[in-house]
Amino acid sequence: MGLAVTQNGLARATSSLSLNRSIMLMAQDVYREPDDTIIVGNDTDGYTFALERGGELVLGSNSVTEVLPDDSDDTAPDSQVQKPSVIALEGETIVLQSDSRVTVTGGDISIEASTNPRLQGSFGGLGDPDASPAEVIVESGAIIDASGDDTTVVSVARNYVQVEARGNELADSPLQRDGAIRDETLVVDIREGTEFLNIEGAVASIERDVHERLSPGGTITIQSVGRVSIEEGATLDISGGSVTYSGDQVAPSQLVTADGQVLDMADADPNLVYSGVFGDFAFDHEKWGITETFLPALSYYEAGYIEGRDAGILEINAPGIVFEGNLIADTTAGIHQRMAPEDLAAGQFNALTRSYN
C-alpha cells in the first residue's frame, strides 16, 4: 500500500480446499490533519489518522498478478464451503498496461477507482464522469481472467452412488419399508436420480478437489466514481470451466416387480410391489409351480465425456464507460447437457452508467 504503487513482476498466491487467498494492491495515502471530530482511527494529540487519498496503481506491461488452485490431491464434500479467492485493486487511477495479466481461477476480481477510499461505497452510474479524476484504464493486450478451472479428470463411475435402503432412505416410500428391497444396497446414477429412495446423503458425500470446486466462472467487478475505459484488444474472461469424466465399467441397480418387470432405478415407482433386486436370486411362483431365476446384473462400459460449468459475471459501474475490448464468456455443453441446456448458466454482463459508448 502506498500513494503510488507499481507492480512490474509476478505476484502469486495459491488457493486450497481449506484456505482462500487474496492479493490486494492499494494505492492509498494515510495522512493526518487537525480535526476536533474523530472520524476513524485513534485521536493522537488532536489529529485523526485516516485513509483519505487515492493514488496511482499501475500493473506494468508483462506483469502477472494471479491466484491459482494448488496441486494438492486433497478432496472435500460439497458441505464444506469453498470461499472464492480475491484480487483487489484500489486507487484513484488504476492502469493495467498492455500485456499485463490478472488471474483468479474461478474467483473474484475487484477493481475500484476512487479519490477517497473512505467513500468507496458511493459508486454510482448517474454522476458526471468529468467531475472526478478517478479512472480505470485497461489497455490493449491486458487480460483480466476469472474463468473456471478445466483441468479436473474423474471416473464416470463417480456418478453412481451406493445407498442402503433403510428407514431414512425409504421415508418417502412407506410401501417399501417392509418390502423385499429393504436393507438392500442399491447403485443409483445421480444424473438420473430416483423417486424410489432418498439419495441426498450419498450425493452430499461425494468429494471434489479444489480444481473441480473452482470450475465455475468467477466474478469481475470494475467500479469508478469517474470513468472506466476498456480499450480495443483488452480481454475480460469469465468463461465457465469443465470437468472431464473418463470412461469406466458401471453396474447400476435394477429392481424386479412382483409381476416380473425389470426397472431401472430412475423408473422405479415407489408405489409398486417388488420381488427383489435384479441379479442372482430366485423367485418361486407357487401358484404355477415354477421357479424363476434372475442372473447377476451385468456391468457395462460407459464412455467418457466432458461436463461444462457455469460462466461467471462481469459488472461495470461508473458514470462514464467505454468498452471496446473482448468479453469471453464461453461454456462447454457436454453430451448430457445438450439434452438439458437450461442447467448450464451463460455469463452475465451488467453495466450501470449514465451514458454507454
Feature roles, as predicted:
Residues 1-357:
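Extracellular and secretory-pathway beta-repeat/beta-biased strand scaffolds
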